Amino acid sequence: MEMVDNRQALMKMLVKELGFSEKQVRHVIQLTEEGNTVPFIARYRKEWTGSLDEVQIRAILERWQYMMQLEDRKEEVIRLIGEKGKLTGELRLQIVKATKLQEVEDLYRPYKEKRRTKATIAKEKGLEPLAEWLLLYKKEDPAKKAVEFINAEKEVQSAEEALQGAQDIIAEMISDEATYRSWIRNITFRKGIMSSSVKGEEKDEKNIYEMYYSYEEPLQKVVPHRVLAMNRGEKEDILRVSVVPPVDEILNFLNKKVIRDNDSKSAHYVQLAIEDGYKRLIQSSIEREIRKELTETAEEQAIHIFSENLRNLLLQPPMKGKVVLAVDPAYRTGCKLSVVDDTGKVLHIDVIYPHPPVRKYDDAKTKVLSIIDKYQVEMIAIGNGTASRETEEFIVDVLQSVKQEVFYIIVNEAGASVYSASDLAREEFPNLQVEERSAVSIGRRLQDPLAELVKIDPKSVGVGQYQHDVSQKRLNESLTFVVETAVNQVGVNVNTASVALLQYVSGLSKTVAKNIVAKREEDGKFTKRTELKKIPRLGAKTYEQCIGFLRILEGANPLDRTGIHPEQYKNVELLLKSLGLSIDDVGQPQLQKRLEEVEISKLSQETGVGEPTLVDIIDALISPERDMRDELPKPLLKKGILKLEDLKRGMELEGTVRNVVDFGAFVDVGVKQDGLVHISKLSKQFVKHPLDVVSVGRIVKVWVDDIDTKKGRVALSMLPIE
């Protein structure tokens, strides 16, 4: 019964903390414990959750997991202290009421098994009674009292040694007091300073950390990216980083708390013990705790930015139905070419040498013109790596000789080389060279960014900030969640999807994804969703979790094309029948007209299906193959080129946001280097974070603010330059 009550109390805390209703929190936890996935709950259990989205559901589950860990630790600490016979009712209550793991550890600290410290050695020498006597603040002279504790057998040779031992005991007592540590932690964070100085300037060849060579900032004001920059500089042995606490204020606080009689002769010795206790035992551990907390906050921010950037990258609109010529640029080894048809099938692989040192420019031009004509190429995708701008100039020249309308686009090729050398790429294209696979990947990225990018480790897609300096476990969890959410929001064509894409579908493991592809290759395309029940290791629960996200576009049942879950098929058929329609009318204009006239609340009462689910069903019936990505702005198509020398201050340009960081956004305006729009130039209004204004893949209007031709840098502004 106590466990049930405790769960309910924790849920109430969660409700208060996150601002959701008790019903929402309870249902999310219950549904998860029953084996339902986050995408499934978000999509198909809206009535239960009050239409919470994936991010909100995850926030509840993460906080709940922390609370469970906290409760487990409390129980363990209570047991450990109890076994020592030192658990009082008051201490038990303090532990039970703790809301953070740090508070529990502070309370447990005095009872922890300690390695031999100065205090434990002093206690072994029988000096604890002297320490207790000093804290009574009697009128007697401590030096005289200490004589009683001289003991050659216990290696206490003098009164001074006895007093020193007693002070060591008092110092540890102060260090172990949870309320003191908590106050010191808070005041250090509120009034302390983050300081960095140069340690190994010769190692900082590019002067990356120059601003931190002599740097101070209040702890409360240090922004996440500076915390991570200083951490990295310290790790590389270039910087010396420390926390400077308000020492005098802390010592005054401890003196007032511990010394009850300043006139007593004991006060002097206790004061020395206080200073030693703080400087030797508390200061450095509080500094570690604060820096750990700052780092964790900074990591969360870096992971959040990376996750948002990745989400926007994955959800870029696909270029459907286009034959694409993809170019993976290079100098010496030549530009690799691939032509992929509108389904992503590879039609042609080639190589050209338009650049030095080989430079067969005319041959390259003739070959590209021939390819465009032969395969009726509609779009050219150029990777943005080495030799990208020179290749762009070459393609612009080629396009001047092309009669039909062909556009080109610069594609972010980050991670393409990682993918092309992977086992997955070797499996997919066993007969292609690494660079040829890379060219195919670039072309397919343009056609369907999501389907192609899931094949790459999310950390390699080039939209992170300090991703190598954060907790890799936490980063992987967050990025996997982003990919899963994107894949399930879009839905997957089960007859064309790769294992890499299928493994992110709600409920599916990599093994089951492989089994689906193997079955498809063996027996041909799936014609209805129910056929997936025959897949090895795809049981009833897995089927329930995954099937709504898997689409069969040319199947026997038109509902299998939609995001409607089969559990609702009977209700859908009854709904259509009541309107004089059938499932064969799905996606037809007459069905759209009739459904738009439907009164949702009335229909909900008649069918017993919740309103949010009904809205989703009607949307799916009207637009069965709707892709949420189609509603986003299309990538920026190009026909001409810009050079750095062409730019003038105040020039208005259109560009694509390539990366968003704490201090601004990098925008590709068609010159060699992406230009930086500093956070201060994003909007006339105050901008808390660049992500509030821009996102990866977004097309933005910018003005040239400053050009540094020497360093090849461009400063841009989203505010008109006067």
Model-assigned labels for residue ranges:
Residues 37-38, 49, 53-120, 125-157, ...:
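Accessory alpha-helical DNA-binding modules that contact the DNA backbone or grooves
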Residues 56-59, 66-326, 332-420, 424-431, ...:
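Duplex nucleic acid-engaging cores and interfaces of nucleic-acid transaction enzymes
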Residues 103, 409, 415, 420-490, ...:
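Long, charge-rich intrinsically disordered scaffolds of nucleic-acid metabolism proteins
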Residues 648-662, 700-702:
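Structural detector for short beta-strands of small beta-barrel domains
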Residues 662-667, 674, 712-714:
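Short aromatic-glycine-enriched beta-strand elements
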Residues 667-683:
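OB-fold (S1/OB) nucleic-acid-binding surfaces
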Residues 687-701:
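Short nucleic-acid-contacting surface segments enriched for D/E, G, S/T with interspersed K/R
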Residues 710-722:
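OB-fold/S1-family single-stranded nucleic acid-binding modules
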